[in-house]
A protein has these predicted regions:
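Conserved G1/Walker A P-loop phosphate-binding module
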Residues: 1-111, 139-140, 144
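C-terminal-of-GTPase-core extension/linker across diverse P-loop GTPases
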Residues: 2-6, 17, 144-351, 358, ...
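Flexible interhelical turns and helix-capping residues at alpha-helix boundaries
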Residues: 9, 131-134, 192
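Phosphate-binding glycine-rich loops and adjacent basic patches that engage nucleotide phosphates
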Residues: 12-17, 45-57, 85-109, 121-130, ...
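Amphipathic alpha-helical transducer elements in NTP-driven molecular machines
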Residues: 32, 46-49, 62-68, 82-95, ...
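Conserved Switch II/interswitch segment of TRAFAC-class P-loop GTPases
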Residues: 40-45, 72-82, 93-155, 168-181, ...
Length: 364
């Protein structure tokens, strides 16, 4: 899974990326300090991995991972090549979802590219650039299919849908907010529209606001309204605070958050929201050689889940031996669970569940 972190210059985008990856991307108070996208691979926090590691004492522990890409700051006119627009748009096409960092803090020492704090305008600026780029892409597809329609009348429905979609974009509606059937959504996916990508608005606020009553931050409330209207996710975060937390040990982090009265760090919540947004979950494999989490789409059946490990597992799938994480923990060991007949044998139609611990049987 690849997530692109975007935002106007000086909204805290690179600070958030640094906190996520500890990759040390240069976070500077001027536009375009991130010219090439910095890429960081981040472990997905999962307490089940830790518990299984205690049980198995494995030689290797491999958590699920997410790839974060810090994409250069965007300005008005990017779709026409202003600023670093063309690079920005090409990099963002490659991600599965967008984390749009929005400035919801006031600080006279950190300039805003437009001179004043206005998250609604900032969101509209980026969304409009994505829409303008999409309009050009869509028009090229319409022209191509219209030409091909002379020899293939079955494309008429496609052209009609793409024209309808372009009308929505022309009215500044994000593709992801347009109501459509599953079949139409499948058709739209063949065009790779930027504004169709799922979005989490990360509201970067001051430490004081983040630890206090969120509803008192007027900027956060405005972003929540926008997210609700287009069916996107919104998450309050303090990038500066997360950068500090990222330097702490696990124990120090827990103590620090407890002192602030915060149950979970913003980054953990961001990763969880990303999973939810993309409809992802994890199953686990456990043994002395390795304890590992594997990321799959919700609704994935056992053979396809096995294929994440190796294509031979899917091709020669016989059955899956499955127990839930909670059931295993309750019984203390796999041997005890097997004695009680709690390890199930599941076939090709079994739909994997989050937290399943599984051993695949296969033959090729």
């Amino acid at each position: 899974m690849k997530l692109g972190i975007v935002g106007l210059p000086n909204v805290g985008k690179s600070t958030l990326f640094n906190a996520l990856t500890n990759a040390g991307a240069q976070a500077a108070n001027y536009a375009f300090c991130t010219i090439e996208p910095n890429v960081g691979v981040v472990a997905v926090p999962d307490y089940r991995i830790d518990k299984l590691a205690q049980m198995y004492s494995p030689d290797k522990i491999t958590p699920a991972t997410i790839e974060f890409v810090d994409i250069a700051g965007l300005v008005k006119g990017a779709s026409k090549g202003e600023g670093l627009g063309n690079k920005f748009l090409s990099h963002i096409r490659e991600v599965d979802a967008i984390i749009h960092v929005v400035r919801c803090f006031e600080n006279d020492d950190i300039m805003h590219v437009d001179g004043e704090i206005d998250p609604v305008r900032d969101i509209e600026t980026i969304n409009l650039e994505l829409i303008l780029s999409d309009t050009e892409v869509l028009q090229r597809r319409i022209d191509r299919d219209t030409k091909a329609m002379k020899g293939d009348k079955s494309l008429a429905g496609d052209v009609q849908f793409f024209n309808f979609l372009k009308e929505q974009l022309d009215n500044a509606v994000n593709a992801r907010a347009v109501e459509m059937t599953d079949e139409q959504r499948e058709l739209m996916s063949t065009v790779a529209l930027l504004s169709s990508k799922p979005v989490i608005y990360a509201c970067n606020m001051s430490e004081e606001d983040f630890a206090g009553d969120l509803t008192e931050n007027k900027y956060f409330n405005k972003v929540k309204e926008i997210a609700a209207a287009e069916g996107s996710e919104v998450l309050p975060i303090c990038a500066e605070l997360e950068a500090q937390i990222a330097e702490l040990s696990k124990e120090e982090k827990e103590m620090f958050l407890s002192e602030l009265g915060i149950e979970k760090g913003g980054l953990d919540l961001l990763i969880q929201k990303s999973y939810d947004l993309l409809g992802l979950m994890s199953y686990l494999t456990a043994g002395k050689p390795e304890v590992r989490a594997w990321t799959i789409k919700k609704g994935t059946k056992a053979p396809q889940a096995a294929g994440k490990i190796h294509s031979d597992f899917e091709r020669g799938f016989i059955r899956a031996e499955v127990i839930s994480f909670d059931e295993l923990m309750k019984n203390g060991s796999m041997a005890a669970a097997k004695e009680k007949g709690l390890v199930r044998s599941e076939g090709k139609e079994y739909v994997m569940q989050d937290g399943d611990i599984v051993l695949f049987r296969f033959n090729v």
